[in-house]
C-alpha cells in the first residue's frame, strides 16, 4: 500500500458509509425497520473490516467495481452482531459508542429483526456482484457463512457466554477471540484474495496473516 493508513481510511470510510446507506435506502421495507437499521449503521465505528477488504486489494494493486459491495457485506454482518450482542438476553448493554443501543430506542423485537435483516442483506449483496464470476460469489458466500456462523462468530459468542462464570486459560481465550472477533477479520482479508483471484498458495499466505491480525486485534 503506497498511501498512509490515515489517508486510506479518510478516503474510503465515507465511501463505505455511502454504500451502506444506499443498500438499505433502496429496500422496500417498513419504515421503522429501515430506521432501526440506519440507526445502527450511523452508530459510528472505524469500519475496520470493510477497510481490510479494500486495503488487501489496494496492496495488490487491484481495483474492482464491486469491492465496496463485498466490503459492506462484512460490515452488515458485524453490525447485526453488535445489535444482538447488546440485547438483554446477551450482554444487556444500554449504550454503545456513547449512544443508546438499538433495542433501547426501538425495542427488543425490532432490534432483533433489524439484525436479522442486516444478516440477510449481507448475503444478498454478495449475489449482486456482477463483476465477479459465479465461483467467486459462491466462495465468498461460503466463507462469510462460516466466519459468521456456528464455526465462527456465533460459536465464539457462545464460548464467551459459557466462560463468564469462570476463569479461562490462554487456550480458551484464544478460541473465543479466533471465533468471535478474528473470524470476520480473517474473512475480510481472505475476501480480498478471492476478489483478486490469487492462487491457492497466495491465499494460504494471506489466510495465515489474517489469523494473526485477528489475534493482534485483541491486544490493548
Language model features with spans:
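Mg2+-dependent prenyl diphosphate-binding active-site environment of isoprenoid biosynthetic enzymes
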Residues: 12-14, 24-220
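N-terminal amphipathic/basic leader segments beginning at the initiator methionine
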Residues: 1-24
Amino acid at each position: 500500500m503506497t498511501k498512509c493508513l490515515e489517508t486510506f481510511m479518510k478516503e474510503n470510510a465515507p465511501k463505505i458509509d455511502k454504500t451502506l446507506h444506499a443498500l438499505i435506502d433502496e429496500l422496500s421495507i417498513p419504515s421503522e425497520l429501515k430506521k432501526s437499521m440506519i440507526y445502527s449503521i450511523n452508530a459510528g465505528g472505524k469500519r475496520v473490516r470493510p477497510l481490510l477488504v479494500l486495503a488487501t486489494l489496494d496492496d495488490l494493486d487491484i481495483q474492482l467495481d464491486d469491492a465496496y459491495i463485498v466490503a459492506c457485506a462484512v460490515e452488515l454482518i458485524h453490525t447485526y452482531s453488535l445489535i444482538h450482542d447488546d440485547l438483554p438476553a446477551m450482554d444487556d448493554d444500554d449504550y454503545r459508542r456513547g449512544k443508546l443501543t438499538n433495542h433501547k430506542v426501538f425495542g427488543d423485537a425490532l432490534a432483533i429483526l433489524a439484525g436479522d435483516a442486516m444478516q440477510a442483506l449481507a448475503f444478498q449483496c454478495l449475489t449482486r456482484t456482477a463483476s465477479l464470476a459465479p465461483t467467486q460469489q459462491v466462495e465468498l458466500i461460503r466463507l462469510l457463512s462460516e466466519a459468521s456462523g456456528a464455526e465462527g462468530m456465533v460459536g465464539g459468542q457462545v464460548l464467551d457466554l459459557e466462560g463468564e462464570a469462570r476463569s479461562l486459560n490462554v487456550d480458551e481465550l484464544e478460541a473465543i477471540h479466533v471465533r468471535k472477533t478474528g473470524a470476520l477479520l480473517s474473512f475480510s482479508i481472505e475476501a480480498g484474495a478471492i476478489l483478486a483471484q490469487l492462487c491457492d498458495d497466495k491465499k494460504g499466505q494471506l489466510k495465515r496473516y489474517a489469523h494473526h491480525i485477528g489475534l493482534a486485534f485483541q491486544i490493548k
